[in-house]
Amino acid sequence: MKKAWIVDDDEEMMRAVQLMLKLLDCEVRHFFSARPAAQTLLNGERPDLFVLDINMPEVSGIDFLEFIRRRKDFKNIPVVMLSSEATDVMIDRAMALGADAYVTKPVAIEELEEAIKKAFSAHVENQ
């Protein structure tokens, strides 16, 4: 079973995504902000996948994505960005920073499943 971490400050959206990930046979852990997720990473725990919201208080999903990709020990973990922000500029920025997939809210399970498969596929190809 794959371990997925959702980092999203929207509890309702988190619950919906969590349900979708469980249907896709993922063990899910949720963080309401990037700081505790980063601390958990630094303490040695690792997911097999990140699902990151972009707009969050304190540390944005983009900033957390940059943190993940800068660290040698985290940079190969697949990342799916999940946001209501669907501008080409934001999508291009996230992808340029190393996101493996970008999904806009509201999300259908098929779309999330495809993004997760894409992220895992990109991760395997890059190892």
Describe the role of every protein-language-model region.
Residues 107-116:
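C-terminal output helix
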Residues 30, 58-59, 96:
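Residue-level signal for the "D+5" position in two-component response regulator receiver
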Residues 30-49:
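Acidic, metal-coordinating helix/loop segments flanking the phosphotransfer/catalytic sites
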Residues 14, 57-58, 87, 106:
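The feature encodes the CheY-like receiver
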Residues 53, 83:
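Active-site residues of response regulator receiver
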Residues 11-29:
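Two-component/phosphorelay signaling modules centered on CheY-like receiver
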